[in-house]
């Protein structure tokens, strides 16, 4: 069975934490296809600071050394907000016989009940939840705990060989980097070069983004 991983985010900007997390995931799971999915107008996050075109360009630059990583722009090409359920339905129509796995952060798992038609997500894809220790102390919503009790399975072969319906928690390493922090530091003219791929850093400086 062809296995597909979908890593969604605003990537505003894409940073080394995104890359290192993805490399760790691929080293452990080895998905046949791995897509970075830039979001358009996230329904439960503030609007992005860079344009869609700029965010895609930064992704292209960041992923140049990693030809196995692809970019999927279907959310940007849509005229509606970024509802993941629509995106997964689109993937499922295109890849009817494949295993689909949506990669989300632990904070995304806690916020899952806020997602549009969130109950349908698990029927369309597996969930690979990236553990982040700072969220472990937060209470898990009852609806999410019920979901975990029913669908959690940390056997990686389940994700690779089942169309949908499993949740796996995985520690991909801890990287103290966030797009929000990078934007704030750039605005304060602080050095962020070590947190960004070199080509992305050069692009941000050239475009004078996040100033």
Swiss-Prot record:
Catalytic reaction annotation: nicotinate beta-D-ribonucleotide + ATP + H(+) = deamido-NAD(+) + diphosphate
Enzyme class: transferase
GO MF annotations in UniProt: ATP binding; nicotinate-nucleotide adenylyltransferase activity
GO BP field: NAD biosynthetic process
SUPFAM superfamilies recorded: Nucleotidylyl transferase
The entry's keywords: ATP-binding, NAD, Nucleotide-binding, Nucleotidyltransferase, Pyridine nucleotide biosynthesis, Transferase
PANTHER family cross-referenced by the UniProt entry: NICOTINATE-NUCLEOTIDE ADENYLYLTRANSFERASE-RELATED, PHOSPHOPANTETHEINE ADENYLYLTRANSFERASE
Protein name: Probable nicotinate-nucleotide adenylyltransferase
UniProt organism field: Legionella pneumophila (strain Paris)
């Amino acid at each position: 069975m062809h296995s597909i991983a979908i890593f969604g985010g605003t990537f505003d900007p894409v940073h080394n934490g995104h890359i290192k997390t993805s490399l760790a995931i691929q080293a452990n799971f080895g998905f046949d296809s791995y897509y970075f999915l830039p979001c358009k107008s996230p329904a439960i996050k503030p609007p992005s600071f860079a344009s869609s075109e700029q965010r895609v360009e930064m992704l292209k630059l960041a992923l140049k050394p990693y030809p196995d990583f692809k970019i999927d722009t279907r959310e940007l090409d849509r005229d509606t907000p970024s509802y993941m359920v629509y995106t997964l339905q689109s993937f499922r129509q295109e890849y009817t016989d494949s295993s689909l796995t949506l990669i989300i952060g632990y904070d995304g798992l806690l916020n899952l009940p806020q997602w549009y038609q969130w109950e349908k997500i698990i029927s369309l894809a597996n969930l690979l939840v990236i553990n982040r220790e700072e969220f472990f102390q937060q209470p898990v919503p009852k609806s999410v705990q019920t979901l975990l009790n029913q669908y959690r399975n940390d056997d990686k072969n389940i994700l690779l060989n089942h169309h949908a319906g499993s949740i796996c928690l995985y520690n991909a390493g801890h990287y103290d980097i966030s797009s929000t922090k990078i934007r704030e530091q750039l605005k304060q003219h602080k050095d962020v070069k070590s947190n960004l791929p070199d080509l992305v850093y050069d692009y941000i400086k050239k475009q004078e983004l996040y100033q």
